[in-house]
């Protein structure tokens, strides 16, 4: 029951993802961070098979870092998204990754942006996007309330509405979410929305 969604506001982009590590009917942990910081001004929120998700996002992160190391300048968000799409398309003909990605970033020239990349290497620049079962509810909620000139506070309020809708509509809804933001000041954690915490000590 993975849920990943994001939106672009006035000078920033926000992505949110559930934090449940699930296999079949088993929940392994409630604090799995599915949003990776690619570099100082890029975020990748991913859903899909856990092994593919971790391996592919780390592969993209290392290649983005390698490009900056070799050339002395970072990739733009559009370039990083196109690189990611290209790698997914190449793998699709050999050993496909079951992973869907929302890439958010901020560039000095073009500002904040959000890219939708699915497991068959479809790439679109979007104002809002979502993957997983939660997309049925988060997309409709964002369609109703989203504006391109939203402030950070308004965008977070909309994200909370989406999380509430997902929790109230899905039979097996993920309890916890992580929210991250990227703007001119960089990519960073914004908040966690927790209704369940991992039990770290055994109960006798």
Swiss-Prot record:
Signal peptide residue numbers: none
SUPFAM superfamilies recorded: N-terminal nucleophile aminohydrolases (Ntn hydrolases) (SSF56235)
N-acetylmethionine found at: 1
Protein's GO biological process: proteasomal protein catabolic process
Function: Non-catalytic component of the proteasome, a multicatalytic proteinase complex which is characterized by its ability to cleave peptides with Arg, Phe, Tyr, Leu, and Glu adjacent to the leaving group at neutral or slightly basic pH. The proteasome has an ATP-dependent proteolytic activity.
Main location: cytoplasm
InterPro entries, per database record: Ntn_hydrolases_N (IPR029055), Proteasome_alpha (IPR050115), Proteasome_beta2 (IPR035206), Proteasome_bsu_CS (IPR016050), Proteasome_sua/b (IPR001353), Proteasome_suB-type (IPR023333)
Protein name as catalogued: Proteasome subunit beta type-2-A
């Amino acid at each position: 029951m993975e849920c990943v969604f994001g939106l672009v506001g006035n000078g920033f982009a926000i992505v949110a993802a559930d934090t449940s590590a699930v296999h079949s009917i088993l929940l392994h942990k409630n604090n799995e961070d599915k949003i990776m910081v690619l570099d100082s001004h890029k975020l990748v929120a991913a859903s899909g098979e856990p092994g593919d998700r971790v391996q592919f996002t780390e592969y993209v992160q290392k290649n983005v870092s390698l490009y900056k190391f070799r050339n002395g300048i970072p990739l733009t968000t559009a370039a990083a998204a196109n690189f990611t799409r290209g790698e997914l398309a190449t793998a699709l003909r050999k050993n496909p990754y079951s992973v869907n990605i929302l890439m958010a970033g901020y560039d000095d020239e073009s500002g904040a942006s959000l890219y939708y990349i699915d497991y068959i290497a479809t790439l679109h620049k979007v104002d809002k996007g979502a993957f997983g079962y939660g997309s049925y509810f988060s997309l409709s909620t964002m369609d109703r309330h989203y504006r391109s000139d939203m402030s950070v506070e308004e965008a977070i309020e909309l994200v909370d509405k989406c999380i509430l809708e997902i929790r109230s509509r899905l039979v097996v809804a993920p309890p916890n979410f992580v929210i991250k933001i990227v703007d001119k000041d960089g990519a960073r954690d914004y908040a966690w929305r927790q209704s369940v915490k991992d039990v770290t000590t055994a109960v006798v």
